Amino acid sequence: MKTDKKNGNQPKTLPVKNGAKSASTKVGAVGKSDSHVEEKGHEHSGVFGKNTELIFSLICGTALGAGFGLSYVAGMPELVSLILYIIAYFFGGFFTAKEAIQTIMKGGFEIDFLMLVAAIGAAILGSWMEGALLLFLFSLGHALEHYAMSKARKSIEALTSLAPPTALVVRDGSQQEIRIEELVLGDLIVIKPNSKIPADGVVIKGEGSVNQAPITGESVPVDKSPVPDPNKDYTNEKSIKPQYRVFAGTINGAAVLEVKVIKEAKDSTISRLVKMVNEAEKQKSPTQLFTDKFEKYFVPVVLVLVAALCFAFLVIDEPFSKSFYRAMAVLVAASPCALAISTPSAVLSGVARAARGGVLIKGGRPLEDLGSLNAIAFDKTGTLTEGKPQLTNVIPLNGISEEDLLVVAIAVEKLSDHPLAEAIVKGGLEKLKKQSIPEASKVKGITGRGVQAEVGGKKILIGNKALFEKDNVPAEIIKQVEDLEKGGHTSMLVKQDKDFIGILSLMDVPRKEAKNVLKELSALGIKKMIMLTGDNQQVAEAVAKQIGITDAMGNLMPEDKVKAVQKLDKSEKMVAMVGDGVNDAPAMAKSTVGIAMGAAGSDVALETADIALMGDKLESLPFAIGLSRKAKGIIKQNLWISLGVVAVLIPLTILGVTSIGPAVMAHEGSTLVVVGNALRLLAYKNNQKQTIKSGRKKKA
C-alpha cells in the first residue's frame, strides 16, 4: 500500500470523508451504487423522486409570486400574503433545514445554514417577501447545481451499466441464463456475437476480436484465442496474456466465444474500476485542503462580523431593523458556497472524463499533481518498448541466401522455449511466409551461450560471441556484431559445419507511438524525461536515440531506480514514474505521481498506482496530463470566481449598496457558474492539443 507523498496527502487507501456515506457502500455485481453522495454529502429525493428539490423550489416560487401579487390587490387581507410567504418558507427552506439538522447532529456545520438564518432574520424584521425570495433563489440554485453535478456523476454511473445483467452459462451439459451475481469461479459461459461479455475470464474455445474500449480505451478490437490449457485454474494467475483474457463490460465481435470465469462479478475489473472512481471523488486535492482550511477560519470571522453589524445602530444613526437587515445581507454575501463546490465539481468531472478515456485517476491529489508535472521517469521495458524481443536483422554470410539462413535458424530454435528463440521463430516465419521447415535433431542447449543441433545432416551452432571464442571468428564478422550491439541489438552468430553462414540480431524495439508521445509531452510542458532500465547502458542509449529521449540510465536495479527518481524529484520537484505498477512499485512510491500502464490486467497495478492507464497505450499519457492541466486551470478559475464574488459583495452589502435579493442572486449565480465551468471537463477531447507550461496555457 502506498503512503502519502507530499502536501499532506492522504494514504492511498482512499478513505471516505467522515459523516458522509461511502459512494460505494453497496456496490453490486458491476459496481452499482445505491446511494451516490456528492461532496457535500447530500442526495435529495422524496415524494417527487430525484426532482423533489426542484419541485419544492418551484412551489416556493409560486407561493412567493402569489403572495407578492396579492399584496397589491385592494382589500386583500395581509394575512393571505403572509400565509403564502410562510408556505414559500417551508418549501424553500425544507432541504436546507433538514441538511443543517443532520449535519449538526453529527457534530458538523452546514454552511448553507447561514442562508436559513438570514431568511429567519428577514422574517423577524417583517420582511417576509425578501426572506421568501432568498429561499426561492437559494433552493432553485441548489436544485440546478445538483442537476448539473448529476451530469458528471452519470458519466461515472454509465460505467456500471457496461456489464450485462445476465450470462449464458453451461451447466450439466445445457445452456441456461442466470444473473451474473450467481456466476462462480470456473463456470463456462457462452458469449454470442456482438454481445457484451458478462464476466472476467479466459477464452476456452473460439477465436475472434473483442472491443475493449469501455475498459482500456483501445480504439482497435483485440484478437482473442483459446488458452493452451483449458483445464488449468487461472483464478490466481498473475500474468495472463492479453490474447487469452477478456473483461466484463467489453463487447464481443462476430465469433462465438466460450469463456471460463476467473473472477466473481463483484470482483471484476469493471466493478473494481467503478468502486475506485467513486472513492476517488472523496479524495481531497491540495486546493480543496486549502479551501477547507480557508473556510474553517473564514466562516467564524463572517459570523463575528455579522454579529457586530447587528449593533451598527449604536454607532450610526439608523434603526436596529436596518442594521439587522444589513447584517443578514452580509451573511448571504459572505456564505462561501461557490468556494466549497469549486474544487469538488472539477475533480468529479475530471475523474469521470478520465475514466471514460480508459484512465483511472485516484482522486483530486493525483489529478492536480499530474497537471503540475515538470519531469517524467519511464521504465524502458514494456513502457517505451514493446517488452519482448523481435527479430530485427538477418545478415547472410558466405554466399548463403537469407531464406536458407532463416530455414536453418528456425529449424533449430523452434525446439527451444527461450524468449530469444521464440522471437527468431516468429520473426523468421513472418519473413518466410509459407515455406516448409525441416526437422532438427540432436538439439542441445549450451547454457548462457546458445544451442547446437543437426539439420539435414549438418552440424549447426547458434549463439553469442562467447560460444565461438575458440573458433577465430573473422574480424569483419566481429565488427558487424559489435556495430549491431552498439545499436542496442542482441546478436547471434550462425555456424554450419565449419562456415559462419549468418548473423541474427534481436531487440526489444521501441513502441511505434513512443516518439510522438514524447513530443506531445514536451509540448505540454514536461521539461525533462528520462528512461530507467536494467539493460546495459549501450542498449539504453540506443533506444533513447531512436525515440528522442535525452537521458537514459542503464544497469539499474530496482533500488537504483528509486534513487534515480529521488534525485530527479530534488531537481524538478514534481515527478511522475511510469511503469507496469508491479516491478516499478518502489520507484512509483517515491515519485509525486505513480502511473501504471496496462493496469486492466493487473490487480497489483490497480492498487499501487496513483493513476492507472487501463489499456497498454502510451498515448493515453498525454491525454491524461492534458486533461489534468485543463482541470487545474478550471480549478484556479473557479477559485477566482468564487472568492471574487464574495470580495465584491461583502463591501457592497456593508455599505448598503446591495440588498439581500441581488446578493443571493449573485451568490447562487456564482455557484452555478463554477459548476458549469467544471462540467466543461466532460467535453475534453482525447486529441485536444494544448501547449501548457506548469499548468498555464500558452498560445500554440
Predicted regions and their residues:
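Helix-interface capping motifs at the ends of transmembrane segments in multi-pass membrane proteins
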Residues: 62-90, 102-111, 116-131, 296-334, ...
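Juxtamembrane helix-loop transition segments at the membrane interface in multi-pass membrane proteins
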Residues: 101-109, 144-162, 345-364, 679-694
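Conserved cytosolic catalytic loops of P-type ATPases
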Residues: 158-267, 365-409, 454
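Juxtamembrane coupling segments of multi-pass membrane pumps/enzymes
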Residues: 18, 110, 135-193, 221-231, ...
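Transmembrane helix-loop-helix hairpins at the membrane interface
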Residues: 42-166, 293, 394
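Flexible metal-binding regulatory segments at protein termini and peripheral loops
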Residues: 1-78, 158, 171-174, 221-223, ...
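Membrane-embedded alpha-helical bundles of multi-pass transporters
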Residues: 69-74, 99-100, 105, 117, ...
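Cytosolic catalytic headpiece
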Residues: 364-583, 587-593, 626-629, 688-700
